[in-house]
Swiss-Prot record:
PROSITE patterns given in the database record: G_PROTEIN_RECEP_F1_1, G_PROTEIN_RECEP_F1_2
Result when mutating Y310A: Decreased G-protein coupled receptor activity in response to serotonin
SMART domains assigned: 7TM_GPCR_Srsx
Gene Ontology MF terms: G protein-coupled serotonin receptor activity; histamine receptor activity; neurotransmitter receptor activity; serotonin receptor activity
InterPro entries in UniProt: 5HT6_rcpt (IPR002232), GPCR_Rhodpsn (IPR000276), GPCR_Rhodpsn_7TM (IPR017452)
Protein name per UniProt: 5-hydroxytryptamine receptor 6
Protein source organism: Homo sapiens
Main location: membrane
Effect of C110A: Decreased G-protein coupled receptor activity in response to serotonin
Keywords: Cell membrane, Disulfide bond, G-protein coupled receptor, Membrane, Receptor, Transducer, Transmembrane, Transmembrane helix
Length: 440
């Protein structure tokens, strides 16, 4: 972030001989800030350890999350504790030489967190809109280059201008004695805010809006394909039965409702992510520009807006993994939980639950989402516990060869509509399975 600047090494404020007494009633504020600091450090440390220790989470997409959690961890360990003392005592109570260093780390860590959020949105954008070419575009070396570029930009926007005094160019106001606040000039604030917030936030809005439109479009495609294939299968079997005109329409409505709910969930997810980002950071950057123009923001209000931006580093390790099913499973294996072993044994003992017709599940492949004929080597599912699979195989055997070749190919990105936050980047080689080809 670009905090309200503080004194440089050339300034000579009247630093206090020792820490002053904290104002009355600050005990509750100190307790709340300590909880925020502890939660930020613990949550980010836990998720970094989770990704490093769980092989299922070691992929290119999660590399950006490690960078995000690292920047947020630095905010919790390096930036928040001095900021808490600064807010409680109303002045800088640490060593004088640490003021400029802390200010530079404040700018760098918060800017790196915002830039990492931008990289995550770009990674999601490439993974959803072109999953088959994702591995060719987002290689580990390119991901490393993007992360290093984000950290380099954050460092250049913090240490270099502050050490060289660029933030004071054209600024006539002297620093307040004993304060550690960055009193930057308007040109510096505009350039730094544009590079570290406004441009990344524009990219985040663009990519997430494109993802939302693609998710809605693909949800409609999957619903129409599933409905059409179900009706084709019922016509091909041609089993004599009493006609029930309301059954097909009810099934179609159920499928359409299910996929509409998935699209709605995607919309809510993006709304939460974008809303959290802008609610925490936009007020601070607006106040930062206003402060550089008119110097009319009180220190207390500016501290509140600054801590609101800090809270983004607290919520990132909670919100982002909350919508990723692989993180939930890995967290259940990583943390000691008395119920987890029994649940895993129960799931392993009843494989028929995973092959039943329970509807499409997020994170599955296209063959598992749509009622496609199974490959010939899946004979293990032909027992009594998987009657749905044998019924699909019978449907495929009854199709005529001429009819099978006339089916249009499935869109290769249809599986992405199931849950665009749980796509596995390790399996981008998704090939459409031709409908109606006999498996024998």
């Amino acid at each position: 972030m670009v905090p309200e600047p503080g004194p440089t090494a050339n300034s000579t404020p009247a630093w206090g001989a020792g820490p002053p007494s904290a104002p009355g009633g600050s005990g509750w504020v100190a307790a709340a800030l300590c909880v925020v600091i502890a939660l930020t450090a613990a949550a980010n440390s836990l998720l970094i350890a989770l990704i490093c220790t769980q092989p299922a989470l070691r992929n290119t997409s999660n590399f950006f999350l490690v960078s995000l959690f690292t920047s947020d961890l630095m905010v919790g360990l390096v930036v928040m504790p001095p900021a808490m003392l600064n807010a409680l005592y109303g002045r800088w109570v640490l060593a004088r030489g640490l003021c400029l260093l802390w200010t530079a780390f404040d700018v760098m860590c918060c800017s790196a967190s915002i830039l990492n959020l931008c990289l995550i949105s770009l990674d999601r954008y490439l993974l959803i809109l072109s999953p088959l070419r994702y591995k060719l575009r987002m290689t580990p070396l390119r991901a490393l280059a993007l992360v290093l570029g984000a950290w380099s930009l954050a460092a250049l926007a913090s240490f270099l201008p502050l050490l060289l005094g660029w933030h004071e160019l054209g600024h006539a106001r002297p620093p307040v004695p004993g304060q550690c606040r960055l009193l930057a000039s308007l040109p510096f604030v505009l350039v730094a805010s544009g590079l570290t917030f406004f441009l990344p936030s524009g990219a985040i809005c663009f990519t997430y809006c494109r993802i939302l439109l693609a998710a809605r479009k693909q949800a409609v495609q999957v619903a129409s394909l599933t409905t059409g294939m179900a009706s084709q299968a019922s016509e091909t079997l041609q089993v004599p039965r009493t006609p029930r005109p309301g059954v097909e329409s009810a099934d179609s409505r159920r499928l359409a409702t299910k996929h509409s709910r998935k699209a709605l969930k995607a919309s809510l997810t993006l709304g939460i992510l974008l809303g959290m980002f802008f609610v925490t950071w936009l007020p601070f950057f607006v106040a930062n520009i206003v402060q550089a123009v008119c110097d009319c923001i009180s220190p207390g209000l500016f501290d509140v807006l600054t801590w609101l931006g800090y809270c983004n580093s607290t919520m990132n390790p909670i919100i982002y993994p909350l919508f990723m099913r692989d993180f939930k499973r890995a967290l259940g294996r990583f943390l000691p939980c008395p119920r987890c072993p029994r649940e895993r044994q129960a799931s392993l003992a009843s494989p028929s639950l995973r092959t039943s017709h329970s509807g499409p599940r997020p994170g599955l492949s296209l063959q598992q989402v749509l009622p496609l004929p199974l490959p010939p080597d899946s004979d293990s599912d032909s027992d009594a516990g998987s009657g749905g699979s044998s019924g699909l195989r019978l449907t495929a055997q009854l199709l005529l060869p001429g009819e099978a070749t006339q089916d249009p190919p499935l869109p290769t990105r249809a599986a992405a509509a199931v849950n665009f936050f749980n796509i596995d980047p390790a399996e981008p080689e998704l090939r459409p399975h031709p409908l109606g080809i006999p498996t024998n």
